[in-house]
Every structure is written in C-alpha cells, then in structure tokens.
Amino acid sequence: MYKRQDKTEESYQEAEKILDKYERLRNRRNQPAKVLSGGERRLLEISRALVMKPSVLLVDEPSIGLEPRYISMVFEILDDLQKAEKKTIILVEQNAKKGLEFADIGYVLVSGQTAIAGKGDDLLKNPDVGRLFLGG
C-alpha cells in the first residue's frame, strides 16, 4: 500500500539537504536568523524558497544592502542554482554590472518601459546602458 509522505517531514529533509550544501548556514543552524549577517540572511531567504523545489525562482534585488563579499556569495549561489540545478531565475537588480554579468538575457528599463534588451554580455559592452543608468 502507498503511504503519502508527510509534508512536514519532506520539508525537513529538503531543508537538511540545503544545509548540507551551504556550509555558512550549516555552521549557524542553531542560531536565530536575527544574528545572521546580511549575506547569510539572504542565503537563508533563498534556501527557504528552495525547500518548495521550484523550477523558477523570482529574485528581487539580491545585492541590496550587502557588503561586496556577500554580493559575490549570493551571485555564486544563484549561478550554481542556474547551472547545476537547472533553475530558471528571473532577477531584478539595480547593480547593473552584477545583474548583466549573471543574465543570459537582460532588459534595461526606464520609467517602467524596456529601453534596451539583449544578451547580458552584449549589454555590458553597450555604452547606452551606462548612459541610461546615469540618467542620460
């Protein structure tokens, strides 16, 4: 007879897998979230979403308020999720360089409208992108 696994147990097992994968969280597992650094909290937020096993992640401003070392850590994790775990990631990011380095396809918006679209690498080289970010 088939017995459906309890969702709480399944979520717990998934959380354990995520903790095993990210040493920074594993080492702080028994501490409250309020004592985590900004980067560790951002990783915890991403990890909480991963427990649900989504095929698509919507990520809003992952670098906002973080020190540069944590910005790099967050983008390394997103890159790993995209490449190793084949997750589709839709990202909104005001840090143009980081966002476009990460993007397969990027969109530069001005007043809510698409001003320029293209491959992330191409947009990084496009001088119009810099002008738009500087308000030109």
What are these regions (language model features)?
Residues 32-36:
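Conserved ABC ATPase signature
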Residues 46:
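Hydrophobic anchor residue at the start of the ABC signature
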Residues 72-86:
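Helical segment within the ABC ATPase nucleotide-binding domain
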Residues 49-50:
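ABC ATPase C-loop
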Residues 105, 117:
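Short, glycine/charged-rich "phosphate-handling" switch motifs in NTP-dependent
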Residues 53:
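Conserved catalytic motifs of ABC-family nucleotide-binding domains
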Residues 57-61:
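Catalytic Walker B motif of ABC-type/P-loop ATPase nucleotide-binding domains
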